[in-house]
């Protein structure tokens, strides 16, 4: 994501965090829809 990033592991951590965050948001939306 960031050009010239010295550590490629940071991108992986960011994408992993973003994926878990979006998944959590989707779960909350699903819960609110069921109620």
Curated annotation (Swiss-Prot):
Protein name in the entry: Putative gastric cancer-related gene 224 protein
Top-level taxon: Eukaryota
This protein's encoding gene: GCRG224
Tissues in which the UniProt entry reports expression: Expressed in gastric mucosa.
């Amino acid at each position: 994501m960031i050009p010239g990033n010295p550590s490629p592991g940071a991108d992986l951590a960011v994408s992993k965090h973003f994926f878990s965050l979006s998944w959590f948001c989707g779960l909350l939306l699903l819960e609110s829809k069921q109620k």
